[in-house]
């Protein structure tokens, strides 16, 4: 039994809708052949090229290749997304940062100059609203980049910063000491990602206070935030983020990255409470992804539905109605690769590079991918399409799942199917908050209903 706050509500504007995830550097280049704003960035003009994967001279992977995707490019493709039935775009980080993934934030208050400007972001939000589309941002608040105005190990931002100046106002955000690799506490030992203390008052105020990071971007037009590694943020910090989000509007959305059942998680020496009404609106639904992909690959229907029902039974109804359901993300293999290709099984990037399923295996995989998305679009929660899945892009994990969108792709057979599924969600009330009722889950068959207040949808 999950006991949650009696007044727990989640945004009505999310329920029954469709999300689309974009990795900003790899979607569309609105301003072509732009100069690199920093000398240590490598521009990739060939949009069909594979992302860099070979280690550099010191054996590392710096994520320094940029394909030039930008905010203007996303704005140009709003009609395309609207045709796909997209209601919300979830963007991987857009704040200034010195890697193509931008999870090593350098400046929380400014768009990365390769993506555009703060004004470009506001223009994107305004243009998206005309299509009924909202923009959800990725907030990385458990760590910053070492190459940032806050830490500044590399010296890019002058003489200040916590690493270089013991009197820096940012010094108290971090832990320093000889017991740490590199002399400071970092995220999973990556020295380019110094961890912050989320209980430090000045940091909390910077992120969640009036005029802070959350407030600034929501007022610039964002529809909400996804919290990176929510498991590693204290519940009290998440609650303050929620307060900052809802202070702007109860309809602003707060999503968390959690890979398992979010109601049974333990951390910080206690059971986590972030999904019980005072923290997150909902979470990324990895258990559904695993169950659906395993089912279309041959896993018994009974086992897949048991895993799905477990989440439905554990999650508070307001959170279940807004859970983000997906088959691919920037952190996982693309769905078609999972369905149709060999598992990597620990094999390295050299083996993964250039792999592409073709022929009968591809055609069979495409049929199974279509079925998987039909399930994802009709289960409780909100479906999220990872950019490129609609044209059957392939790829193992980072960086192969982050190739540039193939705008000249011949494969277009999934697009109308996904658009029809989106239209179904928009026109059938049962897909907003309808109860999941299982009629049969055996012999490779899933047969269920979504039972709404006035309509019932039946799916086989």
Regions found by a protein language model. Give the residues of each.
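Active-site-proximal helices and loops of the catalytic beta/alpha 8
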Residues: 125-134, 142-143, 148-159, 213, ...
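Extended acidic/polar, glycine-enriched regions
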Residues: 1-13
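Aromatic/acidic polysaccharide-binding cleft in carbohydrate-active enzymes
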Residues: 25, 267-269, 273-275, 281-282, ...
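Aromatic-anchored helix/helix-loop segment that forms the rim or "lid"
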Residues: 305, 309-311, 345-369
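Substrate-binding/active-site clefts of carbohydrate-active enzymes
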Residues: 19, 24-87, 94-220, 241-247, ...
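Carbohydrate-binding surface patches
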Residues: 439-460
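Hydrophobic faces of well-ordered beta-strands that scaffold small-molecule active sites
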Residues: 18-20, 89-91, 135-137, 225, ...
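Conserved, mostly hydrophobic/aromatic
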Residues: 22, 81, 91, 108, ...
């Amino acid at each position: 039994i999950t006991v949650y706050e009696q007044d727990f509500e989640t945004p009505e504007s999310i329920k029954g809708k469709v999300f689309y995830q974009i990795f900003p550097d790899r979607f569309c280049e609105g301003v072509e052949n732009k100069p690199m704003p920093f000398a240590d960035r490598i521009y990739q003009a060939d949009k069909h090229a594979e992302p860099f994967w070979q280690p550099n001279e010191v054996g590392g992977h710096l994520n320094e290749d940029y394909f030039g995707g930008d905010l203007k490019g996303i704005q140009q493709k709003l009609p395309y997304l609207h045709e796909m039935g997209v209601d919300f775009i979830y963007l991987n980080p857009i704040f200034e940062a010195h890697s193509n993934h931008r999870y090593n934030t350098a400046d929380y208050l400014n768009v990365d100059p390769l993506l555009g400007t703060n004004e470009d972001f506001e223009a994107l939000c305004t243009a998206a609203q005309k299509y009924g589309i909202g923009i959800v941002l990725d907030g990385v608040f458990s760590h910053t980049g070492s190459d940032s105005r806050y830490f500044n190990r590399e010296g890019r931002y002058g003489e200040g910063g916590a690493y270089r100046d013991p009197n820096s106002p940012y010094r108290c955000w971090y832990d320093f000491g000889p017991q740490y690799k590199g002399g400071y506490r970092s995220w999973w030992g990556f020295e380019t990602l110094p961890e912050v203390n989320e209980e430090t008052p000045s940091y909390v105020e910077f992120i969640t206070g009036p005029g802070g990071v959350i407030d600034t971007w929501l007022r610039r037009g964002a529809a909400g935030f996804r919290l990176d590694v929510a498991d590693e943020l204290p519940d009290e910090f998440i609650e303050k983020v929620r307060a900052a989000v809802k202070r702007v509007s109860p309809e602003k959305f707060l999503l968390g990255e959690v890979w398992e059942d979010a109601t049974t998680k333990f951390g910080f020496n206690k059971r986590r409470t972030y999904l019980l009404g005072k923290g997150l609106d909902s979470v990324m639904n990895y258990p559904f992804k695993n169950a659906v992909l395993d089912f279309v690959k041959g896993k018994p229907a009974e086992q897949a539905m048991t895993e799905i029902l477990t989440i439905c039974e554990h999650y508070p109804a307001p959170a279940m109605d807004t859970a983000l359901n997906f088959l691919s993300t920037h952190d996982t293999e693309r769905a078609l690769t999972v369905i149709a290709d060999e598992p990597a099984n620990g094999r390295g990037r050299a083996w993964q590079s250039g792999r592409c399923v073709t022929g009968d295996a591809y055609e069979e995989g495409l049929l199974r991918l279509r079925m998987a998305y039909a399930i994802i679009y009709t289960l409780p929660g909100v479906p999220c399409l990872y950019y490129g899945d609609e044209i059957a892009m392939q790829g193992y994990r980072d960086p192969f799942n982050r190739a540039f969108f193939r705008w000249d792709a011949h494969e277009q057979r999934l697009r109308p199917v996904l658009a029809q599924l989106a239209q179904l969600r928009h026109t059938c009330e049962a897909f907003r908050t309808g109860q999941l009722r299982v009629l049969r889950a055996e012999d490779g068959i899933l047969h269920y209903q979504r039972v709404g207040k006035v309509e019932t949808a039946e799916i086989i």
